Design a protein with these regions (language model features):
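Ampiphathic alpha-helical segments that act as solvent-exposed interaction surfaces
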Residues: 141-159, 163
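Surface-exposed, proline-enriched loop/turn segments that connect beta strands in immunoglobulin-like
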Residues: 86-88
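Functional cation/ligand-contacting sites centered on basic and imidazole/sulfhydryl donors
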Residues: 1-81, 90-95, 102-106, 121, ...
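Short, solvent-exposed polar/charged micro-motifs at secondary-structure junctions
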Residues: 94-98, 144-146
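Basic, amphipathic alpha-helical patches used to engage nucleic acids or provide basic targeting signals
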Residues: 103-149
Length: 201
């Protein structure tokens, strides 16, 4: 059985220009590398069996998703507890905070910018009575979500939910947004746009 027959859903991602072979000339278990092109125009090379059996997708889209996951997770859990969260707001410090929950005076950051900016953020948060939690994205989304729940618990915000289900909802919301960026499903995360940043309720 050829790829075109067994995995016809992947035909739209097969890069017909860069591949010498056609989907009708290879099988889903092949270890040959092929070129793929996602619906967003990203092109990448991957073994056919990685794409079919391991269900790996576009590396660029995956990196984008993982870079946004921490902020999306904070807004998702904030929304579950009826809390407003601001994503990427610079209104407090003059430099953007990745996520900020005003009612709790809580900022959660996953990335690390320039060391001087990080020192300045920590100092300015302390001066304003804002608790700054550094929670780097390590491991899987599930690991991060579990660690985030523990971080919330440390400030007496208790979230009891199925973490695997939470991660799936966050991932699906992200993919919906990628399909229709102009109609980002903000309401799913309890969010709305305000100027250059997003507020989540």
């Amino acid at each position: 059985n050829d790829l075109a027959t067994t995995d016809n859903q992947l035909l739209s991602e097969w890069d017909y220009e860069q591949n010498k072979l056609k989907p009708t000339e290879v099988s889903r278990t092949s270890a040959k590398r092929a070129w793929w092109k996602c619906r967003h125009g990203h092109s990448w090379s991957m073994k056919i069996n990685e794409r079919t059996i391991l269900n790996k997708g576009c590396r660029i889209c995956e990196q984008e998703y993982l870079s946004l996951f921490p902020a999306l997770a904070v807004s998702y859990y904030s929304n579950k507890k009826g809390l407003k969260a601001e994503l990427g707001s610079d209104r407090l410090l003059g430099v953007p905070l990745e996520t900020y929950i005003p009612s709790e005076k809580l900022a959660i950051e996953s990335g690390s910018a320039d060391e001087n900016i990080e020192i300045m953020k920590a100092y300015m948060c302390k001066q304003r009575g804002i608790r700054l939690i550094k929670l780097p994205m390590k491991g899987t989304e599930l690991d991060y979500a579990n660690n985030l729940k523990k971080a919330f618990q440390s400030v007496h915000i208790f979230i009891s939910s199925d973490t695997e289900e939470d991660v799936e909802i966050i991932k699906n919301t992200y993919h919906e947004w990628k399909l229709c960026p102009n109609t980002f499903p903000l309401q799913v995360m309890g969010c709305r746009r305000k100027g250059t940043y997003i507020i989540c309720f």
